[in-house]
Amino acid sequence: MVRVRLLAIVLFAFPGLIPAQIIDYHQHIYSPVAGPISIAGWRGVTSDELIALMNEAHISRAVVLSTAYSLANPHKPPVANEREAVRKDNEWTSVQVAKHADRLIGFCSVNPLKPYAIEEMNRCAKDPNLRTGLKLHFGNSDVDVDNPAHLTRLKKVFHVANRNRMAILVHAHANVNFNRPYGAREARVFLEQLLPEAADIVVVLAHLAGAGGFDESTQQASAVYAEAIARHDPRVRNLYFDACVSATASEAPMLAQRIREIGVSRIFYGSDAPVKGNLPVDALARWHAFPLSADEFHSIERNVAPFF
């Protein structure tokens, strides 16, 4: 199946004659513990290695999203002393980011359903290398916003992030391996129940509110947000999207139209994990396959997140 990789490039415009620099808003490093949990046999990637890959692609800065949440995946073999392991993995990310603090910004991560999640968020909020934001992965954590208990827990997590002034980048699509429900209904729950708890912070929906593709469920969910933006719903005032997503050749025009409906000013670049076939240079090479106009490219490429 022919697929077109959509990647939105955000350029940070410096004053004067200095050329704009690319910022990657959806990047990961993986500890020796998280690496093989995420990808069998993989040792992970360090910040030194990421910087080298960024240099190759002429990426100036990146938001590094901790993958500590993967240690708390309910469908993976249990990790010994999980709570401590999650803390240590976030700390590993903090140390890695600190080595290149001029180019990397770290986001803490947790499984929001775990009883220690809020405690770990509060700890991260005091860490200068992680306090900018929080990464949540509803699919990996098997979050179901249609489950009242899950929703109650999520509202607390969003409230605490708002109190700590930590931006949230969230993979909101439900677990695909178990075919959890996801679409317009779940997007409305997110809009109506969760965004009000995070009214004062930036919330970024990863993968244009999908799981990486632009299937029917993602089309439905993203349409809910596009409609809310069109009617100037105050709940989406601080809502943004990273465009780290694939589409079939027939879906690509629809995806471009959705970007236009959302508004290019709300789109950030994101390349995801630097694995074979998806290194930063590969991601950039695919960018111009996507059908946007020169003006749209220019506008998207100059977006800068409020938390920078």
What do the predicted segments below correspond to?
Residues 76-182:
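Active-site gating/metal-coordination segments in enzymes
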Residues 26, 54, 93, 124, ...:
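Conserved, mostly hydrophobic/aromatic
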Residues 19-25, 29, 33-61, 122, ...:
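Mid-to-C-terminal alpha-helical segments outside catalytic/metal-binding sites
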Residues 34-45, 70-72, 82-86, 110-118, ...:
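Acidic-and-aromatic substrate-binding clefts and catalytic sites of carbohydrate-active enzymes
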Residues 6-16:
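Bacterial N-terminal signal peptides
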Residues 131-133, 140, 146-268:
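Catalytic pocket-lining loop regions of alpha/beta-barrel enzymes
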Residues 22-25, 64-65, 107-108, 135, ...:
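Active-site neighborhood of phospho(di)ester-bond hydrolases with catalytic His/Asp-centered motifs
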